[in-house]
A protein has these predicted regions:
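Bacterial Sec-dependent N-terminal signal peptides
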Residues: 1-42
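A non-transmembrane, solvent-exposed segment enriched in polar/low-complexity residues
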Residues: 32-175
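Positions in alpha-helical segments
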Residues: 130, 137, 183, 200-203
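Surface-exposed, polar/charged faces of alpha-helical domains
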Residues: 155-172, 176-179, 183-198, 216
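Charged, long alpha-helical assembly modules
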Residues: 190-244
Length: 244
C-alpha cells in the first residue's frame, strides 16, 4: 500500500508499499478557494508532544527527501491535533510527524477526520479522501494476501520443499494477486486522471523505484492519459527522465 516509507518506528505498521518515501503534488481542481478543517486523533503515545506538519511541494519536482513547503503546523497534545486554513484549490498534501512522513491527505472543503494508530491510518469526511482511503484499504488487503503467500513459500522452503513444489502451491495464486494489485493501481489512476488523486497515486507508485523507469504498468497508465494528466509537473518530469 502506498503511504510513506518509514524509519524503524513503532507507530506505523504498514504493508510493503507503506515503507516507501513519497513525493507530493498539488493539483488544480477548481478555481475557487478551498477551506480545510482537519481534526486529528492518535492512540500512539510516542507522538504526543511532537510537531505535526502539512507539507507539499510547489512544483512537483521536489521529493520528500529534499525540500517541501510547510503549509501548516500544530503540536500533538493528548492524542489530538488540528489544522485549518485556505488553499487556492483542492490539493494533495503529506502529513508529517516532525521529520517522519505519516500519510497523504487531500485538502478539500469540509471537516476532515484523521486517525493515526498502530493498525492503520485513515482520512474521512471528504469525497476525495474517502475515495483515496477506500483504494488504500483494497490495496492493503491485496498486499497482505501477497505477504502471506510469501511467508508460506518461505515456510515450505525451510521444510525442504523444492522450488517446483513451492511454485505449484503458491505460484498461480501469487501471480493472480500481483495482477489484481497492478490492475487496481491502473484503474484507480485512470479513473482519476482529472483530479488530484490520479497524479497523486501515480507519484506514490513511482516512488518505489530508485530512479525513473518505464514499466508495463506505467505505460498502461500514460498511453491513454489526457493532456491535463500528462502536463502535471511531476508526471511530465518523471516521464521525461524515464524515457531518456
Amino acid at each position: 500500500m502506498y503511504i510513506c516509507r518509514q524509519k524503524a518506528t513503532s507507530y506505523l505498521s504498514m504493508p510493503k508499499y507503506f515503507y516507501l518515501l513519497l513525493s507530493l503534488v498539488s493539483l488544480l481542481l477548481t478555481s475557487c478557494a478551498e477551506q480545510y478543517n482537519i481534526d486529528g486523533k492518535s492512540s500512539v503515545s510516542s507522538l504526543d508532544g511532537r510537531m505535526m506538519y502539512l507539507r507539499l511541494t510547489p512544483d512537483g519536482f521536489a521529493t520528500v527527501q529534499t525540500s517541501t513547503v510547510c503549509l501548516d503546523s500544530c503540536r500533538m497534545e493528548h492524542g489530538r491535533f488540528s489544522f485549518d486554513g485556505d488553499v487556492d484549490s483542492v490539493m494533495m498534501a503529506l502529513l508529517y510527524s516532525e521529520g517522519d512522513c505519516v500519510m497523504p491527505v487531500v485538502l478539500e472543503n469540509g471537516k476532515l477526520s484523521v486517525q493515526v494508530d498502530n493498525v492503520e491510518q485513515r482520512v474521512s469526511g471528504g469525497p476525495l479522501n474517502d475515495k483515496l482511503y477506500k483504494f488504500f484499504r483494497e490495496k492493503n488487503r491485496l498486499d497482505n494476501e501477497i505477504w502471506e503467500l510469501h511467508r508460506k513459500s518461505m515456510r515450505m522452503m525451510y521444510a525442504g520443499a523444492t522450488p517446483d513444489d513451492i511454485d505449484k502451491a503458491v505460484g498461480r495464486h501469487l501471480a493472480k494477486l500481483n495482477r489484481q494489485s497492478e490492475d487496481l493501481d491502473v484503474q484507480f489512476v485512470t479513473e482519476n486522471y482529472d483530479n488530484p488523486l490520479g497524479p497523486g497515486v501515480f507519484m506514490l507508485m513511482c516512488s518505489q523505484y530508485p530512479s525513473p523507469v518505464m514499466t508495463t504498468q506505467i505505460t498502461r497508465i500514460v498511453q491513454a492519459a489526457p493532456l491535463e494528466f500528462l502536463s502535471n509537473p511531476f508526471v511530465k518530469n518523471y516521464l521525461q527522465q524515464a524515457r531518456k
